[in-house]
């Protein structure tokens, strides 16, 4: 009895068919996985939104933007991490944040979008994908968002605690927390904050915004300097590090003028195709297109500008 095996040609044809099937199936599998990651990211924001509302119900004000994610820990079942901050440890010249030493390394999955494949750290400090919104734009008009830096004053405007009654544009129309791509300590266009070489005055908002939006694809090749720690550590909320604004729509660069950090453009973004999620003060989450009208996006960042816009 003769035995019939595969010929070389048959084997090659079989391998080609298998390769073709894999090429057809792989994008579908990847799309399904991204859909699941996107849903988890949205759920993370919903959980944060519920915690914000619980905090407001107990304290009568929204949390301080400078410590939002830390202050929400007890409302997320993470009291054990919250208690690791030790205010009795005095700062030192070499380590002014020593009281936070045990808090910063904690990697909190709820604070990281699973679609972001860059490591959020964890050895010395961990990052967050979810910055709080301090307003519609530059601070020339003060902190007009849901959050800010309590007691901080800039150009005569002081950031004070925000009550629900202060949100006159409606809690369903005002941004609370967005998404962004946290830094990976390397100069990447949408992960870093870029220092524009020119100084921009308070009357040059449009010029500043245009210069940031048209940043080259490879900024370091053109001599641009950057700060690459956006989102680190998760428990802090300084402007551009833990808080963002609505100067530019999602997936645009972030910039500051030379020597004028508080007037920076700190932009939302994500690795979801086409845009980013946005948590509103009332707790609902909606996906925002990166092609959203710039004016609509900016109005969503303000709690009281009187514009008649609603969440897309």
PLM region descriptions:
Residues 31-312:
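Internal low-complexity, small-residue/proline-rich segments
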Residues 1-2, 300:
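Polar low-complexity intrinsically disordered regions
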Residues 2-37:
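N-terminal single-pass transmembrane signal-anchor helix
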